[in-house]
């Protein structure tokens, strides 16, 4: 973003318009990423961490692979207009090795379990961001995108 001079435009959009971050778009909102040990936009307090490969175990004890690829349940942290018509525990499609760890858990709009419980969606004012890919998440993902289009924070 800095090399292309896009930081001011992204910061302006995040401050003044409905803003949806998807996957790395969620991660870049935080202060620092372990991926490449780089600073991010620092719009939200917290960091981006890597899944701990060696410790990734499912509830049945089986080893979980990193990156996390596939469908997983998303447990909503409370009511939000972007969750309208989407069941709590609905499955969305993920492809990632890193996840956000907000400094303030009240930013968490959803959590997902994949060896560890991680924040899979965040919300604050006009910002909503997700770790999963709604564009690849069938009806639930399309519903979230439609809700975003109608959203007026």
What are these regions (language model features)?
Residues 11-14, 47-153:
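Amide-donor transfer/coupling interface in amidating biosynthetic enzymes
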Residues 1-68:
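Cysteine-nucleophile active-site neighborhood
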């Amino acid at each position: 973003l800095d090399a292309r001079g896009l930081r001011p435009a992204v910061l302006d959009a995040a401050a003044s318009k409905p803003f949806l971050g998807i996957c790395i778009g969620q991660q870049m909102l935080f202060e620092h990423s372990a991926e490449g040990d780089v600073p991010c936009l620092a719009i939200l307090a917290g960091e981006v961490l890597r899944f701990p490969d060696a410790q990734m175990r499912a509830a049945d004890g089986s080893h979980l692979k990193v990156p996390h690829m596939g469908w997983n349940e998303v447990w909503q942290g409370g009511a939000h207009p972007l969750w309208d018509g989407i069941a709590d525990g609905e499955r969305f499609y993920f492809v990632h090795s890193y996840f956000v760890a907000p400094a303030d858990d009240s930013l968490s709009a959803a959590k997902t379990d994949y060896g560890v419980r991680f924040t899979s969606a965040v919300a604050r004012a006009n910002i909503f961001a997700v770790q999963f890919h709604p564009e690849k998440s069938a009806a639930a993902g399309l519903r979230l995108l439609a809700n975003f289009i109608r959203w007026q924070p």
